Amino acid sequence: MSRTLARCTIAFMASLLATPVFADDRGGYVTVIAGLANQSDQTLDFRNGSTATRGEGAFDSGILGGGAVGYRFDNGWRVEGEFVYQSVDHNGLVLPSGGPSGSGNYASTSVAVNGLYEFDILGSPRARTYVGAGLVYLTEVDIDFEVGSSEQSYSGTGTGIQLLAGARYDIGERWFLDAGLRYLAASSLDLEGEAGAPGQIKADYEPWAATVGVGWRF
């Protein structure tokens, strides 16, 4: 995680030296996004009383959907609040010593406040590239394990940070398209068993996603 954050931070700082976009189109906007979410393998720590064990989780791709409301200033900066749901699948995890097993998903809902900076590297008056970062509150993180008709779920809340980069293209005076990449990092989340599921799981949550969206300025 630290290496990924370091690389993204360097890229963010370098982008601030690029040519800014200071067009006089300040004002509010709304954006709706959808995308393909992914997550690298994670270590899951399972605890049940005095019993503790560890397992490795391998995750497949999944989906992301959400929206944001923001305001763009006339100096290249904008700020926004967003809500996002994302989920990735796993084909089967086994946590020994009485831990859960089976296939399922690893999902979250979150709200965030993002700060973003726009600059011009595409040379088009209609296009704006951007980078940014956000503070994230995970209103729920949930991992499910399904075997047949039986399901065990573990959930919790947490905080994290996210890094964003992308581009926007105007398709009219108010409408625009958006394409971007995002990475979220939340460490050592405590996920409690639900509905009689035994024990607790401690895990990192580090999804990344490629997104497309459409927005409207007001």
What are these model-predicted stretches?
Residues 1-27:
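Cleavable N-terminal export/targeting peptides
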Residues 24-27, 34-40, 68-146, 205-218:
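Gram-negative (and chloroplast) outer-membrane scaffold detector with strong preference
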Residues 43, 83, 87-92, 163, ...:
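Predominantly the C-terminal beta-signal and adjacent terminal strand-loop region
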Residues 66-72, 166-170:
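Short, conserved structural micro-motifs that define repeat-unit consensus positions
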